[in-house]
C-alpha cells in the first residue's frame, strides 16, 4: 500500500516537509509515502484549476507507474492538509455533471484511490475560512469543484481529522463532509482532537497528537482492508 500526500499552505507557501514524518513512520510499516511537488500561486502565475489539475496529473502518473514503483495500484490512498486536502478530494470525487464544460478535456483518470485522508482539509469553498481559495475562482467554477456539492455514492473510504481549537479552518466543515459521506452510503470516520489547534498533525509540534492520529488512521485503514495489521502499529512512538 501507499499514500500520495498533498501538502498544505493554501497554495501560497510551500509545506513539502509537513508530511515527511508521516511518510517515514508509515515506511516502517511497509507503506510507501509519495510527496509530489506542484506549482503554487506564491511562486508561479497559476490559477486554482491549474493547481487542482496538477494534483490529478500526479495521481494519474503514480497510478500509471505503480508497477515500476513497486506499488499496488488498487491500494493507493490520497491525503492532504488544507488546500492539499482539497486536491486529494478533487482526485477522489467525480466532476459535477452539470458543470462538465468547466473542466479541460483531459485523458480519463484511472480508477479512484483506495481511500482519502484529510488533516484539516478544505471541504467547503463557500466557507469564509476558505476564501483564500474559493475567492480566487469565478462563482460557477468554485461551485463546480466544491467538494460538498460532489459527494455521491460509490466513493472510497474517508478518514477526516481536525483540531477542535483550529481558528483558521473550523472543524465543523470536516465533520459535515464525513457525515455527508456516510449519508451517501460511503464509509467515513471523523477524528476530532478537542484541544488541538491548526498545527495538530505536525510531529514536531505535538508528538502525542501525532501518535493518536496515526493510530486512529491506521486502525481505520486496517478495518477497510487497505492496510495490513502488524504489531508495529501498536508499538507507540513515545515509548
List PLM regions with ranges:
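C-terminal catalytic histidine-bearing segment of alpha/beta-hydrolase fold enzymes
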Residues: 175-178, 182-239
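Acidic catalytic loop of the alpha/beta-hydrolase fold
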Residues: 125, 165-169
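Short beta-strand/loop motif that positions the catalytic acidic residue
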Residues: 154, 159-162, 166
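Primarily recognizes the serine-hydrolase "nucleophile elbow" in alpha/beta-hydrolase
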Residues: 57-132, 142-143
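A fold-wide structural signal in alpha/beta-hydrolase
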Residues: 2, 27-37
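Catalytic nucleophile-loop/oxyanion-hole region of alpha/beta-hydrolase
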Residues: 15-22, 34-73, 206-210
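Short alpha-helix in the alpha/beta-hydrolase fold that links the catalytic acid
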Residues: 147, 156, 170-180
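Short beta-strand element of the alpha/beta-hydrolase
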Residues: 1-9
